[in-house]
Amino acid sequence: PDNVPNQDLLTKHLELSLTAVPDPFECHDSFGAHNNAQLMSFLDQFGFDYDFVSSTKSYKSGEFDDTLMKVLEHYDAIMDVILPTLGEERRATYSPFLPICPWTGRVLQVPVIDRNLEAGTFTYQDADGQTYEVKVRGGDCKLQWKVDWAMRWAALDVDYEMSGKDLIESVRLSGKI
């Protein structure tokens, strides 16, 4: 975004989770922490009673593990919901799971080529043709946002989430998942 300082810093950290990107404003541990602080400051102005939940911590601590396993278990059904909403090119490479490269920390957008429910893993192939097996549990992957949204609702027992009219179709889609 043009309204964020230190553009070179951001460019160097493309494809990383925001909690792995240094804060371009230089006042928090990460860009994710900066954005979370901004959100909490805004909510605090109105006196809302809320429990802030860090997505990164929830993925890494295992809080989302059971629900991630349900996504793995229902992978085909989820794909049946998502794929019709995507263009042809994106359908060819889409996966609800986004592995995090153990060497670079980059969030990879690669298709899943195999799944092992018993082991709780999926396999993907990188651009060089190498295959890698990734654990669903423990923070080795994330989910694409519409599936992530549905997963959070289930994992965190969310009954209602506000959204603007620009997200109505996404709410419906995530509700199907």
What residues fall within each predicted segment?
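N-terminal Rossmann-like or analogous alpha/beta NTP/dinucleotide-binding catalytic cores
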Residues: 1-79, 174-176
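Alpha-helical recognition segments enriched in aromatics with Gly/Pro capping
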Residues: 74-77, 84-177
